[in-house]
């Protein structure tokens, strides 16, 4: 837990920043204290080391206390306060150079979400980036702790492994890596080809595009460094829970030709218009609750997938769970809600649509196909935000489901006795939906440009080897 102290020359400014920051709080995950101005009615502008010391002591029931300051003597007063404090409390205190207003707001969101002190400081130091982008200014180098650049071997121990997974370190094995390295008391960095990310973010790992035969290095420093490296090495030896070779595709018995009546399945439309909302805390709370309900859905889908198919299929949805349970996503949406005073739905759409586009633009076809997983998660969260129920169409055997694209969670819920095939105008044979369809014994054709010209109830044949649809 990280608590914050706001130090300002002006009592009004300090209270105002505190008022803004409290709008970010949805729980008791972060306490705020204010030490602003001096007790001199004739000359109230200034800072008082005793006030700073007392403010720090009032929130000292945390692992760390981060002190945010405005200018000049605020820093001197904070440093003097450290000398006055009990050494045990002073050891918890960090002074932050971030801008007072933007930095305090970003730090509050990060601390309230449960981030550690280094991440809270990093977010505070990067707080001006959104404003720079909006003003068309070039981005500044990101302030980060261990992730800013490759860690010197002299500063950390490391282990390198060669990835043997057939499809590289995609979402499912990456989620196992996140889980395996969570909880170690160590600073950890994953490095591939000079690019570094922290292993607590599934999205960052996926965007590294770690392919088969790539070398991946984990660097660690801290009390649990050796244990973390051993866990990484052990997981790599097990190929991150996957076979080294791709499992043979399981096809339906009549895979070469499947016939049925068309059932058009319109892709759910989730485009959210921007809505203004000054209730920042309320919108952030709505989003948190929708994410929590979506995480519950994904746990249920994981259980269903394991009961219906296999642990491999279940790992798709446990991977979705890990991907969604990334505090950086929620923090980014909270920043948008705060900075743009918009609805939770619009902010969440911006964050996940941007992530989906990042996947679409990867040059690894297997990872590129994961864009639909992000959109599946986005759709499910927006359903909860808007309190909207949704049901699959009614199918009568034999049917051919026709759509622009299809979510993995939709394919999971199809009955293979009724749905004999899926025909998509877009889609990918490498998608998780296609993997589930193969295990279910449902034929699938993707990239059929004329798919949406088919009519409901029309009889069609899917020619799988020829990758074409035969009408009539």
UniProtKB/Swiss-Prot annotation:
Any Gene Ontology biological process: glycerol catabolic process
Miscellaneous field: Unlike the carbohydrate-specific transporters of the PTS, the complex DhaKLM has no transport activity.
Name by which UniProt lists this protein: PEP-dependent dihydroxyacetone kinase, phosphoryl donor subunit DhaM
Gene3D superfamilies, alphabetized: HPr-like, Phosphohistidine domain, Phosphotransferase system, mannose-type IIA component, PtsI, HPr-binding domain
Chain segments carrying region PTS EI-like, N-terminal part: 266-472
Stretches assigned to the HPr domain: 156-243
One cellular-component annotation, GO: membrane
UniProt comment concerning the protein's domains: Consists of three domains. The N-terminal dimerization domain has the same fold as the IIA domain of the mannose transporter of the bacterial phosphoenolpyruvate:sugar phosphotransferase system (PTS). The middle domain is similar to HPr and the C-terminus is similar to the N-terminal domain of enzyme I (EI) of the PTS. The IIA domain of DhaM (via phospho-His-9), instead of ATP, is the phosphoryl donor to dihydroxyacetone (Dha). The phosphoryl flow likely involves HPr ('His-15') -> DhaM (His-432 -> His-170 -> His-9) -> DhaL-ADP -> Dha.
Organism, as annotated: Klebsiella michiganensis (strain ATCC 8724 / DSM 4798 / JCM 20051 / NBRC 3318 / NRRL B-199 / KCTC 1686 / BUCSAV 143 / CCM 1901)
Enzyme Commission number(s) from the entry: 2.7.1.121
Residues annotated as catalytic: 9 (tele-phosphohistidine intermediate), 170 (pros-phosphohistidine intermediate), 432 (tele-phosphohistidine intermediate)
Top-level enzyme category: transferase
GO terms assigned for molecular function: phosphoenolpyruvate-glycerone phosphotransferase activity
Subunit structure: Homodimer. The dihydroxyacetone kinase complex is composed of a homodimer of DhaM, a homodimer of DhaK and the subunit DhaL.
Domain of life: Bacteria
Encoding gene per record: dhaM
InterPro entries, alphabetized: DhaM, DhaM_N, HPr-like, HPr-like_sf, PEP-util_enz_mobile_dom, Phosphohistidine_dom_sf, PTS_EIIA_man-typ, PTS_EIIA_man-typ_sf
Keywords: Transferase
Family note: Belongs to the PEP-utilizing enzyme family.
Function summary: Component of the dihydroxyacetone kinase complex, which is responsible for the phosphoenolpyruvate (PEP)-dependent phosphorylation of dihydroxyacetone. DhaM serves as the phosphoryl donor. Is phosphorylated by phosphoenolpyruvate in an EI- and HPr-dependent reaction, and a phosphorelay system on histidine residues finally leads to phosphoryl transfer to DhaL and dihydroxyacetone.
Stretches assigned to the PTS EIIA type-4 domain: 1-135
Record-linked NCBIfam families: dha_pts, PRK11377.1, PTS_HPr_family
Membrane-crossing segments per the record: none
Recorded catalytic activity of this chain's protein: dihydroxyacetone + phosphoenolpyruvate = dihydroxyacetone phosphate + pyruvate
């Amino acid at each position: 837990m990280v608590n914050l102290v706001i130090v300002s020359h002006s009592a009004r400014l300090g209270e105002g920043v505190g008022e803004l920051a409290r709008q970010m709080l949805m729980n008791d995950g972060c306490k705020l204290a204010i030490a602003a101005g001096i007790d001199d009615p004739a000359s109230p502008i200034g800072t008082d080391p005793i006030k700073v010391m007392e403010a720090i002591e009032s929130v000292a029931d945390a692992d760390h206390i981060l002190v945010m300051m405005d200018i000049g003597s605020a820093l001197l007063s904070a440093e003097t306060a450290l000398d006055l404090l009990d050494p045990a409390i002073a050891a918890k205190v960090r002074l932050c150079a971030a801008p007072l207003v933007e930095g305090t707001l970003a730090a509050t969101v990060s601390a309230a979400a449960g981030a550690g002190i280094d991440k809270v400081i990093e977010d505070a130091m990067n707080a001006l980036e959104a404003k720079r982008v909006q003003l068309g200014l070039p981005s500044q180098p990101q302030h980060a702790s261990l992730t800013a650049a490759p860690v010197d071997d002299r500063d950390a121990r490391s282990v390198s492994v060669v990835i043997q997974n057939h499809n590289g370190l995609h979402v499912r094995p990456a989620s196992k890596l996140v889980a395996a390295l969570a909880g170690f008391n160590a600073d950890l960095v994953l490095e591939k080809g000079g690019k570094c990310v922290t292993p607590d973010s599934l999205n960052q790992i996926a965007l590294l595009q770690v392919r088969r035969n790539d070398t991946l290095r984990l660097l660690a420093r801290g009390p649990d460094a050796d244990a973390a490296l051993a866990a990484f090495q052990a997981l790599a030896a097990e190929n991150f829970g996957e076979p080294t070779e791709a499992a043979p595709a399981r096809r339906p018995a009549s895979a070469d030709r499947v016939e049925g009546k068309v059932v058009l399945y319109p892709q759910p439309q989730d485009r959210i218009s921007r809505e203004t909302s000054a209730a920042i805390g309320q919108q952030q709370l709505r989003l948190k609750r929708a994410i929590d309900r979506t995480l519950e859905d994904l746990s249920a889908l994981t259980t269903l997938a394991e009961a219906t198919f296999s642990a491999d299929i279940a790992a798709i949805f446990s991977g979705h769970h890990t991907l969604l349970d990334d505090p950086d996503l929620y923090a980014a949406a909270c920043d948008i809600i705060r900075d743009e005073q918009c609805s939770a739905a619009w902010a969440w759409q911006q964050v996940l649509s941007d992530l989906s586009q990042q996947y679409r633009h990867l040059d690894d076809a297997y990872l590129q196909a994961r864009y639909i997983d992000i959109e599946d998660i986005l759709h499910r969260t927006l359903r909860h935000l808007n309190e909207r129920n949704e049901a699959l169409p009614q199918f009568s055997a034999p049917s051919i489901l026709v759509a622009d694209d299809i979510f993995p969670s939709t394919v999971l819920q199809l009955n293979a006795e009724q749905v004999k095939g899926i025909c998509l105008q877009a889609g990918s044979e490498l998608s998780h939906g296609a993997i589930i369809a193969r295990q279910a014994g449902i034929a699938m054709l993707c990239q059929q440009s004329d798919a949406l010209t088919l009519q409901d109830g029309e009889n069609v044949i899917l020619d799988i080897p020829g990758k074409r649809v035969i009408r009539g």
